[in-house]
């Protein structure tokens, strides 16, 4: 309860300081708002979202206290998933907490191994905004301080240095770990465009370093927020290309003295693929007033294929981008955590022991901690291609 009151206080301070801040609640972050944060807009955290984070954290602690096997908390990660690293025996003693912290520090340090050129700071901010929002969904089980730190870093202009090369299994593990390393006062960050030691920046900005415990390390490193930032950047560029492409095509068609027949309303209605008629209408509007609408005896009956089929090319490119944006919106507003921490989880199929074992109920918390494959970004990856 003390932690929750402190979190609420921090949120209130942020809200007062940032009247025009983008409020995050884990549910409805738009790509437009995410880009605003990337460009420097401050953030605030909705109180109900931080309440979800607190309840999720309480559920994880109670589960650990009751001897449940929890990936990344009471057992290791990766190849060490069957190796017990924490045994609470019904009590979260100082010794148990110390062991948890050692494991978290070790996990962040051992995975901060990316290399190569550093990621554009705007994309780092975008990735952090995405991860903060997905944390606020309540599925990670991290302590509220982790969410607060994401907000503090964004609001105080502290941007972790993230090298762009390196991969380990699924998700952005070796890249995102550098965010956690900066939060614990290690590694490097950018402040006002200058690279400085994280410890120095945290002290100068009056940011208290994270003391990671429980599922904190896993929650910070095991997600796909960096990949989503890169995907959103590509989608944004594609959107800009598609915005000007009809104009470029119209100018080119005029230069060719081309034929408007392939994108007439009669033509596309005759073969009505999704989006085709809308794109054809856009091309006709671009060419409104053009000399191409006047009959010309020298004009070809049919243009070269590259011109004749452009309406299909642009239509399908637009459909692909629309589909990609839909799954991006799902990805940045839901939990990709493994395991997923679900407060007041749906009890479907709990008549089976295999399912019932994931559920926990204590005087303080009720829900489930379930192994997931939600780190899989195949829906986004396929549409990105």
Kindly label every feature range from the protein language model.
Residues 1-20:
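Gram-negative bacterial Sec-dependent N-terminal signal peptides
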Residues 79-101:
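Glycine-rich loop at the start of a catalytic domain that most often binds anionic cofactors/ligands
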Residues 22-31, 199-222, 282, 286-297, ...:
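Acidic, low-complexity proline/glycine-rich segments
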Residues 109-273:
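Active-site cavity-forming subdomains of large catalytic enzyme subunits
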Residues 21-67:
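N- or domain-start disorder-to-order transition segments that initiate the globular core
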Residues 49-69, 149-164, 205-210, 364-372:
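Short, hydrophobic/aliphatic alpha-helical segments
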Residues 253-385:
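Accessory "access/gating" subregions that flank catalytic or transport cores
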